[in-house]
Design a protein with these regions (language model features):
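Short, solvent-exposed loop/turn elements at domain surfaces
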Residues: 67-74, 114, 121-122, 152-154
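Extracytoplasmic substrate-binding proteins
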Residues: 1-67, 88-89, 141-182
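Short secondary-structure boundary/capping segments
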Residues: 51-53, 76, 134-135
Length: 182
């Protein structure tokens, strides 16, 4: 009514969605070459992630503030290409999408990625990432904090998380023989 153009941009739930939305935005905003360049960089990062991924993949859970477990969607695609198979027990997710810490401990993945800050006290949401029950995983699970900002709003930049995931997966794989000896 006011003559202001509005562009409705859908949420990307997969890398295929990222590709189509980025192309659409490039066309709509008069920057198709920029969109193509962003997608080409995304493809290079995907190729690098796949090439460096440990095989067989390590079992992992991405555990986030307030106890949310990332399951499915673009995050799962990026974890998979980086050599991590998501083993978060979907059947144990609460109706709000959180995963009880007991389920994490019972699953005992090779890799537990704690999405957020390693320091305690910056926000109440982070307290579960420091839950004493997680100490039961020491010696069995590689536990690492990781900032996963590229995943907050899906776009070509989101595959930047693949490097972090890949580095952590390779670390978990390298530490696995040492853990087996103890």
């Amino acid at each position: 009514r006011l003559g202001i153009p509005v562009l409705d941009v859908p949420w990307a739930n997969s890398l295929a969605d990222v590709r189509s939305i980025t192309t659409m935005l490039g066309d709509e905003l008069g920057a198709p070459e920029t969109a193509k360049a962003m997608l080409a960089e995304m493809d290079r990062e995907i190729d690098a992630a796949r090439a460096g991924a440990p095989r067989p993949p390590v079992s992992g859970i991405l555990y986030e503030p307030n106890g949310y477990a990332s399951v499915g969607g673009i995050t799962n695609e990026i974890m998979t290409m980086s050599g991590i198979v998501d083993v978060a027990p979907k059947s144990q997710l609460t109706r709000t999408g959180t995963l009880p810490v007991e389920a994490v401990v019972a699953t005992a993945p090779e890799l537990l990625i704690l999405g957020g800050e390693a320091r305690v006290g910056s926000a109440r949401a982070y307290t579960i990432l420091h839950h004493p029950a997680l100490q039961a995983l020491k010696g069995r699970t590689t536990m690492e904090f990781a900032s996963l900002t590229p995943l907050l709003c899906p776009g070509p930049w989101s595959v930047g998380a693949a490097k972090t995931f890949g580095d952590l997966a390779r670390k978990a794989r390298a530490l696995a023989p040492a853990k087996a000896r103890h």
